Amino acid sequence: MSSTQEKPEELDRIQKRVNKILEARLESDKDTLDALSGLSTFFTENTLQNRRNLRSQIEHRSVGINENFLKAFRQVKLSLDAVCEDLDTMATSVETMKSDLETSKALTKDLIKQTNTMQRERDRLEVHKQIAQAFLARFQLSGAEHQLLYGAAKDAPIVADFFRVLDRVQSIHADCRLLMQCGYQTAAIDIMEEMTLHQEGALERLYRWTQNHCRSLENNEIGPLIVEAMSRLQDRPVLFKYVIDEYAIARRAVLVRQFIEALTEGGPGGNPKPIELHAHDPKRYIGDMFAWLHQSIPTEKENLSLLFKKCDKQDISDQLQNALGYIADGVCHPLKVRVETILQAEKDTIVLFTISNLLRFYQQIMRQVVQGGSLEECLVELQKSSEQIYLGALAAQVRSVLQRPSGGSGLALEPPQRDLVPPPSVARLLNMLKEILSVATMVDGRQADITKIVSCVIDPLLQSVQESAAHLPTVDMGVYLLNCLHHMQSSLAVYEYMDERVERLQAQSDAQLDTLTSEQASSLVANLNLGPIYAILQSNQSKIETNLLKIFMSKMDAFLELPDVLLLPQVQLIMSSSHRAAVQKRSFNVIVAIYKQIYERVHDPANGFEQPEQLLHRTPEQVAHILTST
């Protein structure tokens, strides 16, 4: 029964295995595939015997493989044993070394402690070193800076970095105040003293270099270094003044040499030509000399201004003017000698007056550029001298025109001619005066010049005219003087600043007009038989003889027909129509006034004149109208 039951179970197990095998996906089972692949290497023929021996073969092969593993692991074990021995040896060595280290550590403990202490000290000293280096870098000059400040050699030139180092010296000196505030007075004072010495030495070197540079200036090559140097030297007024003096001395010599070269040699290559080539033309010669100075001296002033461009710590305008004055003073002697030579040699009054105006013009121009000094004094002296010379020449020329023909002493004109016109000498002197006054000038002092010139000519001319007319009859003298005065007045009236002189001449003319009017009126009174009648009027007598009135009225009617007939012949010789008309009008007014008195006396019923209309048939208004309309 049990066997019967076991068979189905056995079959089931077999069936399950078969099913399991059948259901297995051998293509995805790598281990099974590898096993089958290995089996194919020794199970080559599928026979019953081979299948029965398969198990034993597999076990045999398994034993062989295990033996190979065992042999291999034996070699590994031997190697591991050797490694273990080495490790044991190393452990022993390590223990030995550890023991030695412990021993050494115990022995060097103090050394290590000392080393650590020294290491900390070194770190502290390193910090101090860095602080000291920073302090020195801030408050001391480096070797390169020291060399820049004092120069590699005695005559080493100044370079731009010199001023940078000098600024650093001044900055260090200023920063020492911070040190003093922080309590480092001793160090600060020492550094300040050292920087002061550096600064003094640097400024002394800068002074020598600047002085030498100024001595060698030829073409005013003022560069930025010399400008900066002057700015730094301003802190030392004495050195600053010495440099300015040296510059002025050098430039004075250069200016004088260039002036002499311009006079004698001209420009480069002869262009422009030497100024002295025009010495025969005084106006151009003197004008060219002053034009050259007018160009050169302002250039010197511009260069001085450039030299002092950065000198803004104090007012140096006086020093600039003094230096410029000293430079310009060098040309005084050669200029004065040449101008005085021209003034002494020239005789033409107009040329002398032109030169005087040139001198005054350039004197005013130069005063705007350079004030004070010998040049200004020289120009003032030359201008005054030229004024005296041309006024003297003018006076001599006037005297030569007015000289007596007989050569006697004193001045006199030609005797007046019958026509009583001004003599030729008057016209000649007035034309000469006109030529002088026509010289164009816009300088200050023109009014004084014109006044002096006019006085130099007109005063002796007036005196001579009056002397020459002294022997003439009254009427002739009046006409002659009036004509001469009119000629002078009309000549001067066209010029400026002549108002006062013209007024004085007009006053003299008015005096002569009064004289001529009086003479003309007296002549009319005599010709019209007004003398007896006028005497009666003046005596306040009421009765006038009728016969006198008839004679007067007869002549009066003839006079009213032709008023000019009774005019003095000399009045017709008056050159000015206005003067002539004035004499005529004033004298006629006298007659009209007398006629009016007579008319009123005759027509007054109290005087008992019969038929006054027949005696005086014209009213005073009619008489005045007739005489004023002629």
Swiss-Prot record:
Give the GO terms filed under biological process for this record: intra-Golgi vesicle-mediated transport; protein transport
Quote the subcellular location field of this record.
Golgi apparatus membrane
* Cysteines paired by S-S bonds: none
Any Pfam family from its record, for instance, is COG6_N
| Lineage: superkingdom | Eukaryota
Topology relative to the lipid bilayer, per the entry, is:
Peripheral membrane protein
An annotated GO cellular component of this protein is:
Golgi membrane
Sorted UniProt keywords: Golgi apparatus, Membrane, Protein transport, Transport
What is this protein's function? Required for normal Golgi function.
Family the UniProt entry places it in = Belongs to the COG6 family.
Q: How does it assemble?
A: Component of the conserved oligomeric Golgi complex which is composed of eight different subunits and is required for normal Golgi morphology and localization.
Protein's name in the database: Conserved oligomeric Golgi complex subunit 6
Show the taxonomic lineage: Eukaryota, Metazoa, Ecdysozoa, Arthropoda, Hexapoda
Q: What is the name of the gene encoding this protein?
A: Cog6
